[in-house]
């Protein structure tokens, strides 16, 4: 594992387990994570692709009122967000 890969593994802090996040899994094939606040969208995309072995179409981010960075990660149609969510114990 290269130094860069090691950094990517530290970007994803935890999955979000809210009603909205669970609805996005089914309706939009999108996973929601709390990520490192300094991570760019490209970093988040690379981290999700490396850790879960999926293709990412789009990443949207926001800073929550608690000061955490939340990332909405839309997966390519050939990958199911519900499969990743079940591996993570979300559903």
Swiss-Prot record:
Which InterPro entries does the UniProt entry name for this protein? Nucleotide-bd_a/b_plait_sf (IPR012677), Ribosomal_uL23 (IPR019985), Ribosomal_uL23-like (IPR013025), Ribosomal_uL23/eL15/eS24_sf (IPR012678), Ribosomal_uL23_CS (IPR001014)
Q: Which UniProt keywords apply?
A: Ribonucleoprotein, Ribosomal protein, RNA-binding, rRNA-binding
Query: Under the GO molecular function aspect, what terms does this record hold?
Result: rRNA binding; structural constituent of ribosome
Show the disulfide pairing: none
Cited Gene3D superfamilies: 3.30.70.330
Q: Which GO terms describe its cellular component?
A: ribonucleoprotein complex; ribosome
Is rRNA-binding there in the keyword field? yes
BP-aspect Gene Ontology terms: translation
Q: Note whether Membrane occurs among the keywords.
A: no
Q: What function does the entry list?
A: Binds to 23S rRNA. One of the proteins that surrounds the polypeptide exit tunnel on the outside of the ribosome.
Task: Check the record and name the NCBIfam families matching this protein.
Answer: PRK14548.1, uL23_arch
Family membership noted in the UniProt record: Belongs to the universal ribosomal protein uL23 family.
PANTHER family xrefs: 60S RIBOSOMAL PROTEIN L23A (PTHR11620)
Q: State the oligomer form and interacting partners.
A: Part of the 50S ribosomal subunit. Contacts protein L29.
- In its UniProt entry, what is this protein called? Large ribosomal subunit protein uL23
The species is: Staphylothermus marinus (strain ATCC 43588 / DSM 3639 / JCM 9404 / F1)
Lineage at the top is: Archaea, Thermoproteota, Thermoprotei, Desulfurococcales, Desulfurococcaceae
Q: Which gene encodes it?
A: rpl23
